[in-house]
Amino acid sequence: MTTQNPVYASQAKPWLKYYDQKFIDQTLPALSAFEYVCQRSKNHLNDTALEYYGRKFTYADLIVNVKKTAAALRGAGVKKGDIITVVSIMTPEIIALFYAADMMGATLNLVDPRYSVEGIREYIEEVDSHLLVCLNVVYDRCSQAARRTNVEKVIVLSPADSLPPAMAAGYKLTSPDKNKYASNVIRWKKFMAGGKDQSTAAEPYDPDHACVVVHTGGTTGSPKGVMLTDDCFNGIALQFQAYPKLFHRGQKLMNVMPPFIAYGFACGIHLPLVLGFTVIIIPNLDPAKLGSLVLKHKPEHMFGVPTHYQQLASDPKLRDKDLSFITNYAAGGDSLSRGAEQTVNDFLAAHGARYPIAKGYGMTEVSSAATVAAGLDNKPGSVGIPMVHTVVAAFE
């Protein structure tokens, strides 16, 4: 009598029946994250890539800004292999900085601006940064954190740097910058001017290059820094192309997630730019205004946490509104109870949305999602099926 070896799901991959063969056969491009955005947008350079408080940046604008920022980094002494610590919310400058560091072989160490002086210092020392980039509103904490570290220069940016002119003037009147800056501080505009005579050449693609260091939430232990490569970011963007009924060039995604988590940058910025979306940047979300923002911008897509969608479902401003533009509003980053999921799904259906709330399961180490429940392949209480090039297995 012979005993057959069991065929494990991780070998048989039964979830592939949900995907078209052309997506199963796709291979990861040997490109940096920035090169992938450039390749995908080369015939759509006049499309809008980013929108920030009404100011729009085309894909051509984005690419030019990235190259200018790379030149400025070289002017500030940044070299291939350097790790730059960034303490900021999401702004157009941070997006350009991410791709600029990526194209020149450097890495961003993304830190939550709410951290204490000691917390920021710990993350600076962890990667031995010589350059620190921070938001002006957290400069005081960052300058204290940088003491007794190897930080030589501090680049300071303002949320107003990319605002439309009238709005920027109003912001500076209502929120004047009262910081007393040290001699090693360079303001963003001066930093950019320092790249005038510097190279904008890109380093060759390196499969081992880490484009970011992000820090885990400590769910399975103490928080730790995770290095994510270009392939990690591009892998997420490639796999989401396997949902052609949901994702189309020219759609809008409202980004409400911060840059210092993998979910925020991989799904909230890189993924939509690779797919040809317009990313509407909401840098510091007031949850009470989420419903108004959805009505104003009418984004087909949003990546958020469960509480965002519970907030929408209970918002009286949305009570009689048509939300049929909603295509894929996805919840991640926290657990979603069956009751809360049903409440949100009832709300979406009552307001004309075609699909229930999308869900996923993953971790920082996989750049966010490993499994996805989206569109009509979405069972209540389930975290979905593995993404097309992801292998999932259960271990005791």
Spans of features found by a protein language model:
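N-lobe entry segment of adenylate-forming
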Residues: 1-57, 61-76, 161-180, 292
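Conserved AMP-binding/adenylate-forming
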Residues: 52-57, 69-115, 127, 136, ...
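Conserved AMP-binding A3 loop
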Residues: 58-60, 202, 211-235, 373
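Conserved structural elements of the adenylate-forming
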Residues: 63-68, 193-198, 207, 226-247, ...
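Structural core segment of the AMP-binding/adenylate-forming
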Residues: 75-76, 103-190
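Conserved pre-ATP/AMP-binding loop-to-beta segment of ANL
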Residues: 178-215, 222, 245-252
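Conserved AMP-binding/adenylation subdomain of ANL enzymes
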Residues: 234-252, 260-303, 311, 315
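Gly/Ser/Thr-rich phosphate-binding loop
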Residues: 300-304, 313-378, 391
